[in-house]
């Protein structure tokens, strides 16, 4: 019986709450406080909403909130679409001319995400209501009835108070009546608003659900202790007892009703952007479901049932989580005056401050609740030890308290982590979006930086831009430590750095939790051990800076490691982008060597980091032992205190508790350092200079002019940078303007100047418009004043042909057909299996060079732009097609009234209809005017052939018109067509969907990794080390127990058995608090204690050393596995067939080499370590528990089964989500790469916002599996923690039920080891699941181990080794050759036979799809012969080594490729030639002249009016892809490279297409002279370049149609070759040249 005569203000006495506590505190103060707070909240909500609805216009806010009053409801509908108040026309825009043309306003109109049409987010049909079903309505009615009953009950009790007895007589019922009146009013409003159509409730009530729930919860909590008092008989009168019991159950029901109902008043509105994708149920889940993560259970069930998930099975994100809404909200926040000067990282932290504060609230509750179970555990053991002095009721209270506190910790921890993951998803979206947006805004060249900035910004690779048509542009910074912002490093920013930053922010709350835990632990230590605790604190303070220094070293190594990773990714990306060139020249081994050198540096830094990490690990392991030993030594030896057993074990337990926060802060500091490095990298990139396009271009008021007024332009601020000087050009509006000039004179740079991509030094550039493309949507189909651009090297999207032409413009069948006709694409659509629905692959890989150029031209022509800039679009097509395009496209009806500026070398073709000509020479305007004026001055051709060609064009124009119906007609004659490029499927699909394995990661994956890791012997050895560590920890614990038994036999075993288990597992929940000092020990016991401390410390040191060795060994073997896996992967990919690269996007390949390799490098080894240790720990713990308390073993089996079931469900789902997460990253990489390469074209079209929007969409596609992966992770963790709480509860119940048969020592060990086992099992499940998910990276890499390889010898049975000098003559024999791309596909080369004699020059011609390129690829064995053979000097190429074959012949490809490095490294990668030989080769291809080589450098630089020729310096840097040289210069460098090799067989594939005619003539002369000892095969569209060859091979439909001397073919007017020459408009000139060559050959033969 509780003594009631207590102090009037005492709340608790002995084992129960006092009467004062029940009556005054819980039943008077609590309701009064609730009434006050509820009234204030309701009034605040009412007035806020009243003013909000009166002042604010009722406009919808579709991006983040939806007005429920705008919904049309029908009682019969279960789910209805959203109808908004006012439908905004989001697709319409004001006329661009009416908008602000200020540069900053223009900038925002192009790039601001706030201006992006949110698309489906603004579509009201995408929103759906979840209506309350009858059960939910019934629950609201039940709530109303109970609240009404409560109101009536308390009114009655208030009236009858004088007649009541006991506690009720002292109640103040007025606060109760007022409180229940408020709650009754709220319940009434909820009933009135059941169908969501009560405007008053919706507008003015605020969140009445939250107010009601908070009140019900607090009232329920206030009645728990009185209910307990009634149960245990401490409430004297019957009426009061029944009141407490009834209030407990009634308020529990009320709380449960709202706890299980959807959160909030309003019916949930779900966003469903796709009809085949279910919306996220998160908005309408109940609070209980939310806390328990049960709302994701249907998703888990689906994954378990199907054993697989597809992307369409994923739920949508919440509306607020979609990246476009996140970005709009973030940018709005960042544009606040107080935030504009903040750095990016600070802005992110402040933006998410509200979510962080929610986390901190949960963290604070969790951090303090962590200590409750251990305190109650000690109390419980004290009761068991002294049963006669304690209360059984209080013991049961302790057991329930342990369960409740663990339950609270579980809820708080997982809400923390869930909020952190939401921050992570949103932050990753922001970072990637900002990086992408910055990439669109950046200048394409580096700019000068202030002296205090070390980072240089190199050029991105832009395949479609030839920025400098002369010898120099931007240097690539040679400093390896500088920040290189090229393609590879930018991809690394978004794939690695964005992840590291966002991942850290998901766990920032750990810093606060650790601080609280450390503070509480240290305070308790001081209370237990006194001033000696400061010794431990001092050691902790000393160790922290030492560890911080080590962390700084780790940070430095991490920065170096990331720099190496960047370099490796750059080299890999460059290699895969140029894989055809690498294979042509058999450079796979050379490039692999260069990549592996960087990889070895990367792994060396990783190993160094692991070594430092091992030192840190030793510090972590030894710290608790060091602190304990020093503290006890100080207490015994300095303070001369007698260290009692209770004090010793309490201190030991608290020191053990310190290990967890110390470990956590160590991990978090490591993550913080890595994230800070990543954030700095992102910050540096975001600070790079942006395009000045909108500042330096002036918009013409009439929207017509394109002009330069005394303009000087340069590419960058380097003194040697190429400069356009004194440009004063007024292009003719609505006419054809032609720019001509020699290769490298600056033609492309003029177009870049008009597009604002060059740096304006002086003058004024006038353009018709700078409005973004989306602002013209309302004018679709009408020619406007915008600009369209067709680059010299076609830039195409990895999409269908049609989508590339449309470029997101509205489809107009008539206009589309006209454009296809004008660009001569009809016949090409017949070639392609799916016509214009054919996927063209990455960089248009399925198309020939001419097809790519025509698709790019069609895109510009189809656009509504009134001004077209065409950069040498005729160079890549044959003469027939060039004439067609010129007549039907450039001069055709679709160009009527549009301004066209055409850069070209084909003067003879383009002068006929040109209205204005600009001739460029060395960056200056040499002459401008009409073609007749320039012709009169002799500037359009100095030789007679050029003049004759222009005259012959005029003379033959009539015949051309007559034959246009025959050869240029819109309907070509039916012909058999072959595929002359990469084949596609019948449905036109080239790019295969990325494969996704199903089910568990297979055993073969683990076996393969173990093989790479070191084999089974290594695994056994590692397991032995883990076992040794665990044995040492157990030995340390048992040493404490044995010493305690020996030295303090007068102290009960419960005081020494219990803490011993704290050293089995580093757990934060094993503290035993003791407030009583044990019996005094004599001073001579101190010697025994000192001996104990020495042995204890020695065991701890041994355990720490072995633990560090374990970490190092695991890291060492992990690095070994990484090295072997990367080496194998690189080798397989580099030697894969070309078809693999055609059908696999580079972004997908790079995903393997970036994110997957990173997982293998840095995530799998720690996972292996954790899984091994946890598994051994669980096994050892089971043995110990079974040994001490055998009755626990069946319970442990049930627990294992429970964990296994939960873990199996989790693993099935998380594995599939991890795979989907990996797959959905690849499109982001691919889209990123495409955008970076095509940024000039995108900006020229003003289409930035569309690409930003597409990037946001792809981020969302990746965020779905990533977010739900971590929600499922929370689902697992909550259930495991709940099982753990139930284990503690059941253990306590078991002890109390058997209290007479168990002592305190056994009870303590049983309970503590049960906790230990639960946490060890939890960690095992988590880490194994994590390992399984990370092994998905190994699985994806192993998938590439099976890609088809190029055979070294196609026919091993007949393998031969040719002599060293082979080939010595250069004879090529093709016998009955037939080729097909795959066994199920038709032949592309059909029974072809021809022979090329040694030293012959043979030109290969034919229409697109004739098979020209296929023949070339067959010579390099890209395709193996299906039938027939190709012999080179009598040796069948199928029988010789592939490397030997490719090194014996040389090709100069149509798309020349250079590699990052120097001119020397590109011309002579193996250092085989002298400087003199290299300069001679450069001179022969006209890249340098004799005069330049003889002139001194000072003389060249002194002439500031001329651009410096960078080819005079062989160490001049070449940017990635050679992007700092023009297309023509790159072709000439490739030719120079071939001149150095001087092979017996050389193949030229349109090698001079981008070179001016004069240079072409010189190059052809060089080819004839320099390759007079070589056999030359040339594919050419310029017939003049091959008409004097020895023979012409005419192909059509995969067959040889003609093969003879060109003059012989021209004598036959019905020949295909004659028709081609006639179509070119240069028939007379070609006949004359062929005749001269024929006569020369006859004379040469007669002399022989």
UniProtKB/Swiss-Prot annotation:
GO BP annotation list: response to metal ion; xenobiotic detoxification by transmembrane export across the plasma membrane
Function: Pleiotropic ABC efflux transporter that might be involved in the resistance to azoles such as fluconazole.
Main localization of the protein described in the UniProt heading: membrane
GO molecular function: ABC-type transporter activity; ATP binding; ATP hydrolysis activity
Annotated TM spans: 28-48, 140-160, 175-195, 207-227, 250-270, 352-372, 392-412, 501-521, 523-543, 612-632, 643-662, 1012-1032, 1089-1109, 1168-1188, 1191-1211, 1282-1302, 1305-1325
Keyword Metal-binding found: no
GO cellular component, one term: fungal-type vacuole membrane
Domain (ABC transporter) ranges: 706-947, 1372-1622
Subcellular location: Membrane
Pfam family, one: ABC_tran
Family named by the database record: Belongs to the ABC transporter superfamily. ABCC family. Conjugate transporter (TC 3.A.1.208) subfamily.
Glycosylation sites: 72, 306, 471, 573, 710, 784, 798, 1042, 1255, 1376, 1503, 1524, 1573
Membrane topology annotation: Multi-pass membrane protein
Description of what induces expression: Azole exposure induces expression via regulation by the transcription factor PDR1 that stimulates gene expression via binding to elements called pleiotropic drug response elements (PDREs). Expression is highly up-regulated azole-resistant isolates.
Binding site for ATP: 741-748, 1406-1413
ABC transmembrane type-1 domain span: 361-674, 1032-1333
Record's protein name: Pleiotropic ABC efflux transporter of multiple drugs YBT1
Keywords: ATP-binding, Glycoprotein, Membrane, Nucleotide-binding, Repeat, Transmembrane, Transmembrane helix, Transport
